[in-house]
Amino acid sequence: MGPQPEQELMGFFSSLGIMTTSEEGRLYPRSLRAESVRDALLNVCDRLGITLICGANVASAHKASEGWALQINRPARALKAKKHDDRKSELRSLRKALADVPRKNEALEARAVIIATGGNPTGIADTFSLPLTSLRPILCPVSATVVGDRAALKTLDGLRVRARLTLTRNHSELWHEDGEVLFRTFGISGVAVFNLSRRIQRGDTILLDVFPDLSKDELLDMLNRRVELLGGFSPRDPRWLDGMLAPQLSRVVCTAFEQCHPGSNDVVHLVSILKHFKLLVEGTAEERSAQVTRGGVSVESISTPSLHACSVVDAPLYVCGEALDIDADCGGFNLAWAWISGIRAASSL
């Protein structure tokens, strides 16, 4: 990324005419609209007379005397799609039109090639004989079940809680993060869960601490004061937890208490449930909406900082962005890598 990537990116965006603003250490276009960045980039391309060929596939690539000889397959005419009021419907129509449009072959010569295909570089990597690591979607929800109560997530569906998530494997802690958790019928979602999805394996355990701001001793003190106020706790009466937890979570917690500590009413055991609510990982979920793909062109096959393909010595070939097997947590890190790596590759031409 370099010694000062933030300053470098701000300078780059400024050179495009994009005004930026900072919020909680994150850089945004001042408009707070992603299309502002897209439009600024397209405007620069237009001013510089850069030709954009959209919807094309690279059918073959061969080294030429000065770079590359490419065969591409492109739409033979402009796309015709039904107009829609909302952008998503319009995009669906355009995708269908792109799939149905007649296509033609065309030869191109290129002094250099930069592969910036995003998360699925399989076809283009094969074309240029680049090694690939396996692909899988990440930064997405996690499929899981509540240990001992497979019906619990149906009860909790749609509930949001602030919690600390701890990922364990073979009784060893691997990772933890605080954040909002959204319960779904298939598992859990939310930004912290998306980050978790980068690290999970089937069979892992997620421990939810629904009182992350309190230590075990502080939570126990609070529960003991509650006993003095309301009387003794009973897992058969979830209403005892009213004012502490959402009713649906209270019911699930009481069920977990009875399963783990049958016959007990001891709030010491309740502390254990509230600080270590267990879910068993089954995998990732809603993968079509994943923000990032893990895997891609192997980083061992790329020279840094130029990002030139090591296996190609006599023709300029570079790989950048998500096409490389590099990924990061939520928070703008993947976008920052896309921008910076694009700048690095282009600067190497």
Language-model regions, residue ranges each:
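Short, histidine-centered active-site or binding-site loop motifs used for metal coordination
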Residues: 24, 321-324
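Predominantly flavin-linked oxidoreductase catalytic cores and closely associated redox partners
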Residues: 35-36, 40-246
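Thr-Gly-centered strand-to-loop micro-motif
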Residues: 110, 320-321
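Active-site metal-binding loops of divalent metal-dependent hydrolases
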Residues: 119, 317, 323
